[in-house]
Amino acid sequence: SCMKAAPMKEVSIRGQGSLAYPGLRTQGNLETLSGPNDATRGLTSLADTFEHVIEELLDEQQAIQPSKENKDADLYSTRVMLSSQVPLEPPLLFLLEEYKNYLDAANMSMRVRRHSDPARRGELSVCDSTSEWVTAAEKKTAVDMSGATVTVLEKVPVPKGQLKQYFYETKCSSKGYAKEGCRGIDKRYWNSQCRTTQSFVRALTMDNKKRVGWRFIRIDTSC
């Protein structure tokens, strides 16, 4: 999040959240289309197609999402994955959830949101961020909801063996405006800072008394 800009004379800086815009990759070739008008119609057709696909995926997600009465619902997290190998792409449910949250926050339909996409208008985010999968071996420890430091277990036992825990973390980029301040803030009059913020996710951990269990821990989730 970009820390709220404060006058140069002021010392305190307060935090302010920001929205993330997930990207969608399309497949297709427009070289066979003739002329700029055909190309425009082709892009519009592709956008309409993906709009319907996203709507269907969101409907399916809501249908299969565990109910509040289900005890396994506590284990549901879009940023944690159990897998035998490193995931190659961002979690699909995470992308869909971020996209839906933005639509709800902006009170927009998907069609209106698509035509007002900042990427289409050449806009840039206030703070640059990077996202990647992180293993429990790389995290080693984390802070739980009670403020205690716990050990993040690398492997989770399953009926047919073991799976590794992976966490999809987002943090401020070390390059660009992360150290120079928030993009769009006049540095002559205001101080600003991009800062990584955290959220809680469910993970298999062990406390200092060697008790193993599923706990909520803090991981980096936005900039």
UniProtKB/Swiss-Prot annotation:
Residues 6-114 form a propeptide. SUPFAM superfamilies: Cystine-knot cytokines. Pfam families: NGF (PF00243). Keywords: Cleavage on pair of basic residues, Disulfide bond, Glycoprotein, Growth factor, Secreted, Signal. Residues 1-5 form the signal peptide. Disulfide bonds join C127-C194, C172-C223. GO terms for biological process: cell surface receptor protein tyrosine kinase signaling pathway; modulation of chemical synaptic transmission; negative regulation of neuron apoptotic process; nerve development; nerve growth factor signaling pathway; neuron projection morphogenesis. Glycans are attached at N107. Gene3D superfamilies: Cystine-knot cytokines. One of its GO terms (molecular function) is nerve growth factor receptor binding. It is found in: Secreted. Belongs to the NGF-beta family. Promotes the survival of neuronal populations that are all located either in the central nervous system or directly connected to it. PANTHER family: BRAIN-DERIVED NEUROTROPHIC FACTOR, NERVE GROWTH FACTOR NGF -RELATED. This is Neurotrophic factor BDNF precursor form. It comes from Eryx johnii.
